Amino acid sequence: RNLAQSVIMYLIEPFFKLTALENDIGQQSRLLNAIIDQWRYNGQIIGREIPLYLTEEDGEQGFAMRVICPEQDSLLPENNNQTVNLAMEHAEKYGLNFQGFQIIADDLNADSTAECSHPAWQMLYTTHLQSCSPLHSGDDFSPIPLYKQLKNQPHLSQDLIKWQENWQACDQLQMNGSALEKEALSEISEINSTLSKHGLYLAAEIEKESGIPTYYYLYRVGGHSLESEQQRCCPQCGGDWTLDAPLFDVIYFKCDQCRLVSNVSWNFL
């Protein structure tokens, strides 16, 4: 995959100064976890397992956490959406003031972030192994931070993260090959499944908001032969959607009318 135009993700430590006299750690943790949730739904941080701990910085007591961010400046206030700011204001009422953050290190295990946040086209794509935005550039396949396009649509951004969680859960089940394998596979590979319908709706809403053609990735596995796979038509309109050459070793099919992309069955790749 060509990731020449991308930048690494970062391990970052935000710090909240504690100015309250009484120390209700349970309540303070809940308020900070609410900020973590909203940062995540806005795409400012990646992943769900966030350590939160008491610490001291420059002689001041407070809380810190370790988060993965797609960019060095992801946590700057200008990237906040309305719901992040509300969670911050709520925490401030209880004496928790966001003081800033320090960059600890580059995260060498993370997926890289797109440098161009407004490509010629983009797609909704994820896998059970990915820890990044589900919005991928059609220019170089790298993930685009959600706040770059959806900061003014918090509900849409959150809905997209929920869709990603569901897609990854189904992918994990079908890859494990045990409980609910068949049902999970049909959710990510059938055009009329609940998950695919949700994803197509989200892609259309994102295109409306961003003005960028936004496609939905339909997973493909099985099939009879490589030859029959290559002759596959668009499952929505029945049209020819085969690309002259595959993109990023993944995308072999692209229907501009239906805003769909797909792979040749993984059985033959």
What residues fall within each predicted segment?
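Domain-scale terminal segments
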Residues: 4-185, 212
